[in-house]
From Swiss-Prot:
Organism in which the protein naturally occurs: Arabidopsis thaliana
EC number annotated for this UniProt entry: 2.7.11.1
Sites where the protein binds ATP: 293-301, 310, 407-412, 448-453, 486-488
Recorded phenotype for the gene knockout or disruption: Embryonic lethality when homozygous.
Name of the protein in its database record: Serine/threonine-protein kinase haspin homolog
Protein kinase domain span: 287-599
Length: 599
């Protein structure tokens, strides 16, 4: 065998003969600047991407990727262009000022003279001004801001300018507006005799004849030293007038002293401040002669001379006789309603509706303070004799009341003794005719004509005059005259406003005992009105006439025959078909009591 060859030793030997293998290392050096003199610039390295241009800066993943190759080239081009800041081109220079000439300051004398002439010229208005007709003159004119006054207080001040006596409530706004516009001179003592009151559309125009709504103020107010002078409406400054009156008298109420409803009541009552009881009663009688003659849930009744004074506490924060006291705004409506019904008693030759059925309101006063000892004495004497169902009248100093001063109408039907059937018929025909007249004049509904709200008295008169929609008629009285009172629940349309009491706020009124005639009548009223008490539903008057017939049949004793009772029952049956008192007054039951037939 041949000699074996050691391959590994040969390999090692050959490597030793060839020498060491050269090592490859990276060498870093500065890049040579391109030759600026060269006109051609090689951009090939940009496209190849072997290196990143230093002018581009670090890679921006957010927006650099969206740039096109062309766009990148344009950026590179700008990097090697002369990027030195360029000088701004010189603008046109102003010519130098010639030597020896002085530049004058601007002269606006002509302009000043022009505007001075304009300012001195009074320019008459060529279009209506929103404030008042005047001239525009140089300078700023400041229109004084009038303080906020209630409508009623404003009109009270206007009436004070026109007349030194107090007038009626301005709730019926047209009354005072019409009066103030037409009067430029001082009126006589019969204040507001020229006022008129609108009536519902169905009433004829003649029914808006002149009426005296509210009497003049009492002697104390009339005697006040308030200057009266001729004055035109446009020259009245309400703010100055209020300040002047405030300085001459401490009797004028302010908004700080009373709430607005009390101020409205003062205006409606013709007062500048509340009275105390002695002041109010002294006008009608000696205070020592005051006697209590009756009471009700909401107040007390006292006799003062030939008048009856009904006192109703208002706006207190505690209950009286178990009931919440009435609010001033509720009494305000009753005050206006009372004055409105007074018009039906006025004997005017042009009156379209007239009747003496509603009690005459002689005066209404707003009082404040506790009961006077004289009144407490009268109250306790009544309590000892009759046993009062009301609370003892212990009231605080700031308690307010409305005192209605009414004509003495006699005794109520509950206590009055009817002698015979003719007197009973007279009662029914007077009540029916009275409701019919008020329906025609004011869409009136009493809504609470129970036997305590009808007063009867005897007199020597055989007949009473009535006018219904212009037709005159005389009613036989047989010596008995009735007066309807208490308009608390009543509804009336004054021509300016509908006054009513929302009975939905008194659900207990309709929860009286079953079988009781008065309670049943309330429930029948509710069914007729469907709880819409503002609406006109003359049928409610008929319901109370039916109630009166029931009272005569079941509660009152008088001389009568079975024939008379049959006539009353027949009348009740026919009344079930009537929708108003105007229809009922034409019933055959009343035909022989009307000297002139109403049709």
């Amino acid at each position: 065998m041949g000699q074996r060859v050691d391959l590994w030793s040969e390999v090692i030997k050959s490597e030793e003969e060839d020498g060491d293998i050269p090592k490859i290392e990276a060498v870093f050096q500065r890049r040579k600047k391109p030759d600026k003199s060269s006109e051609a610039v090689n951009f090939g390295w940009l496209v190849k991407g072997a290196r990143t241009s230093s002018v581009n800066g670090p890679k921006r993943d957010s927006w650099a990727r969206s740039l096109s190759t062309r766009g990148r080239e344009s950026i590179a081009v700008r990097a090697y262009v002369n990027n030195q800041p360029q000088k701004k081109a010189a603008g046109r220079k102003k010519p130098p000022i010639p030597k020896g000439k002085v530049v004058k300051a601007p002269d606006f004398q002509k302009e000043k003279e022009y505007f001075r002439d304009i300012d001195a010229f009074e320019l008459l208005e060529e279009s209506p001004s929103p404030n008042k007709s005047s001239t525009w003159t140089m300078g700023e004119q400041v229109v004084p801001e009038m303080p906020h006054l209630s409508t009623r207080l404003e009109k009270w001040l206007i009436s004070k300018k026109l007349n030194h006596t107090c007038g009626p409530s301005s709730t019926l706004s047209k009354i005072l507006e019409n009066s103030a516009i037409h009067q430029e001179s001082v009126c006589d003592n019969d204040a507001f005799d020229s006022l008129s009151l609108k009536t519902p559309d169905k009433s004829s125009a003649g029914n808006t004849s002149v009426f005296r709504l509210i009497p003049s103020c009492d002697e104390n107010l009339a005697a006040e030293d308030v200057p009266v002078r001729k004055i035109k409406m446009e020259s009245i400054d309400l703010e100055d007038e209020l300040k002047r009156l405030s300085l001459t008298s401490d009797l004028i109420p302010t908004h700080q002293d009373f709430d607005q409803p009390i101020l409205d009541l003062l205006s409606a009552c013709g007062q500048m401040r509340p009275s105390n009881f002695i002041e109010a009663f002294s006008k009608f009688c000696e205070p020592e002669s005051i006697v209590k003659i009756g009471e009700g849930t909401y107040g007390e009744a006292f006799r003062a001379g030939s008048s009856v004074c009904k006192i109703v506490p208002i706006d207190g924060d505690f209950r009286v006789n178990g009931e919440v006291q009435k609010r001033a705004d509720e009494l305000l409506e009753e005050v206006i309603l009372s004055w409105t019904l007074n018009q039906l008693r006025e004997c005017e030759t042009t009156a379209q509706n007239l009747c003496p059925t509603y009690i005459k309101t002689q005066d209404i006063k707003l009082c404040q303070g506790p009961y006077d000892p004289i009144l407490i004495k009268a109250w306790e004497e009544w309590d000892a004799k009759h046993g009062s169902e009301n609370d003892h009248p212990d009231f605080p100093e700031k308690q307010c009341y409305v005192m209605f001063v009414l004509e003495h109408g006699g005794k109520d039907l509950e206590s009055f003794v009817l002698l015979n059937f003719d007197e009973a018929r007279s009662l029914l025909v007077q009540a029916t005719a009275g409701l019919a007249v008020a329906e025609a004049a004011f869409e009136f509904e009493h809504r609470d004509l129970h036997w305590g709200n009808i007063l009867l008295s005897r007199n020597n008169s055989d007949t009473l005059p009535f006018i219904l929609e212009g037709k005159q008629v005389c009613i036989k009285t047989f010596g008995v005259q009735i007066s309807i009172i208490d308009f608390t629940l009543s509804r009336i349309n004054t021509g300016e406003k509908i006054l009513f009491l929302d009975l939905t706020s008194d659900p207990y009124l309709f929860k009286g005992p079953k079988g009781d005639k008065q309670s049943e009548t309330y429930r029948k009223m509710k069914a007729v009105t469907e709880d819409y008490w503002e609406g006109s539903f003359a049928r409610t008057n008929v319901l109370w006439l039916i109630y009166l017939v029931d009272i005569l049949l079941t509660k009152k004793s008088f001389e009568r025959s079975s024939k008379h009772e049959r006539e009353l029952r027949s009348l009740k049956k026919r009344m079930e078909k009537y929708e108003s008192a105007k229809e009922a007054v034409s019933d055959p039951f009343f035909s022989d009591m009307l000297m002139d037939q109403i049709s």
